[in-house]
A protein has these predicted regions:
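The conserved phosphate-sensing helix
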Residues: 21
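Short basic coil micro-motifs at the edges of alpha-helical modules that engage polyanionic partners
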Residues: 32, 53, 68-70
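ABC-family ATPase nucleotide-binding domain "signature/switch" substructure
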Residues: 7-16, 24-27, 41-49, 61-154
Length: 154
């Protein structure tokens, strides 16, 4: 499998989000460049973005600003989740995706993540136990060494 083929099968949501200095619509569309505006809006809805997007002067057409600094960390993370929802890849990697979220944003992100991972393979990189409590399998890795793997369900 080529690197490009592998990349097409993985959605990655990182702890630190980067937004481009273009519209929020185009930032979400980075998940799938040929997506229609309607598909981008649907991904934004599923990612719980509409509440803050509707408050912006130009809505989803507002500019993200340099590195997305006009948005809070939790809002940037939800834009990144919208990208991943739009991409609809069969494998989703969440790398500390809720690390910077305040309680309100974390709740909305959890709803967005539930939407994102339906019928998908999910890999969660986390330091907090609550982030992985619903996992089928937990793998403990320390300094690139696989320490153990087990199920927490009984």
């Amino acid at each position: 499998m080529s690197l490009e083929a592998l990349n097409s099968r993985i959605s990655y949501v990182a702890q630190d989000q980067y937004l481009f200095n273009t519209s929020l619509l185009e930032n979400i569309r980075m998940g799938r460049l040929n997506a229609t505006d309607e598909e981008v809006l649907e991904a934004a809805r599923k990612a719980q973005c509409m509440e803050f997007l509707e408050k912006l002067p130009q809505g989803i057409h507002s500019m993200a600003g340099d590195a997305g600094k006009m948005l809070s960390g939790g809002q940037r993370q939800r834009i990144s989740l919208a990208r991943a929802i739009l991409k609809d890849a069969p494998i989703v990697v969440l790398d500390e995706a809720t690390a910077y979220a305040d309680p309100e944003n974390e709740e909305k992100m959890e709803a967005a993540i539930a939407e994102l991972v339906k019928d998908k393979t999910l890999v969660v990189i986390a330091h907090k136990l609550p982030a992985i409590m619903n996992a089928d399998q937990i793998c403990v890795v320390d300094t690139a060494n696989w320490l153990r793997q087990e199920s927490i369900r009984t």
